[in-house]
């Protein structure tokens, strides 16, 4: 009876969808005491992470081939019909997610949405508008800004904060996003964390930044592949979110595992819904941004006149596998 009551109380608090990876931090904090042992990332954990990303890269390369469907929705007409009817579809990448690796967990989820009457340009405007992330993805993203930007590659910063029942979790994160263009109406991006640091005692007089790869091990790495295609009177978005975290103690898995899966699904759903809402409000061709008086395509505002995706939004160069990106940045 006590066990069932505990699960009900926990599920009541976390029934509200929360944005992206920060949710796993708050979930684990509920079960780890404030005196929990520091969990530094181990070499074998990173090796398992790199191997997993290599497999994700192989799947990505398959979808670049004309012999394979670019979107998962292309494999099932009923699936695509649900998206066009306004559903947001979210599901784990495999049956046993999160996947256990040496001293860690890999969380891997797919999410799909179709946004009618929105072009690929509008979606890119939202995704490259990093200064607006704190508005688009609130309340979890409390600060965001661009660090550097080029034609097809951006580095940006986010501060993620989430309050659990017993603690406030804060993660100070740098990301790198690379955009790739596949014709006028199709493209994809690869995003990965290049630095994740916990802010211990966030919001108190004792707040301090922990070194990278040190701390509670709630989130060690984050990575995503996002595909876009404009057709059928709108734009399809398909994202694969992959996160590496500390393992859950065996004695607590019966509590935490189902909650992590349920809330992970909700957080990806919320993320796609927020992108959809923001894309619907993006400046249309010929309209102007109220902030700077011009339309914008990314971190640097430019005048948008053609109805096709501008050449400065995606790279037309050679595709670099995610594993190569990660080895260079780690």
Identify the function of each model-found stretch:
Residues 1-19:
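N-terminal secretory signal peptides that target proteins for export/translocation
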Residues 290-330:
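Extracellular/cell-surface secretome signature
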Residues 13-14, 23, 74, 293-296, ...:
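Secreted/luminal cysteine- and crosslink-motif detector
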Residues 20-33:
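Bacterial N-terminal signal peptides
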